[in-house]
Design a protein with these regions (language model features):
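Eukaryotic low-complexity, non-globular regulatory regions
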Residues: 1-16
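Compact soluble domain cores
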Residues: 18-73
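Compact alpha-helical subdomains of small soluble proteins
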Residues: 70-95
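A short, surface-exposed interaction/processing loop segment used at functional sites
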Residues: 86-115
Length: 115
């Protein structure tokens, strides 16, 4: 019974984590990205990391938000204010979210890459 409760709790936590719309492809991918890049944004929780990624993804381009569409329906954005970079699929599934070391130059290089 305890194992069933744990499994249901994990399932519910995953549902709540991704309830606001598409997040990463799956929980494992999300956990890996958070472990690798979460500290770049300060001492933030996984929920906050996902919220920031979704916010940048959903913010219209213009002003400090740069956007480039790539082949295969991949969209990249860069926020000049925070230095954050995101890449996501046409269905809004997040591929990556982090702060590149060379900021806007990274975004511009990625925009020119074929895929």
């Amino acid at each position: 019974m305890r194992l069933v409760w744990i499994a249901m709790s994990l399932w519910l936590a995953t549902l709540l984590l991704f309830a606001e719309g598409p997040g990463f492809r799956n929980r494992r991918t999300f956990d890996e990205h958070y472990a690798k890049h979460g500290r770049e944004f300060g001492n933030i929780s996984q929920d906050e990391y996902l919220r920031r990624a979704q916010t940048l993804r959903d913010t219209p381009s213009g002003g400090p938000i740069l956007e480039a569409d790539k082949p295969g329906g991949i969209v990249t954005k860069f926020d000049r204010r925070s230095g954050a970079f995101i890449a996501y699929n046409a269905d809004r599934t997040i591929r990556t979210f982090f702060i590149p070391n060379d900021g806007e130059r990274y975004f511009r290089r990625q925009a020119k890459r074929p895929e």
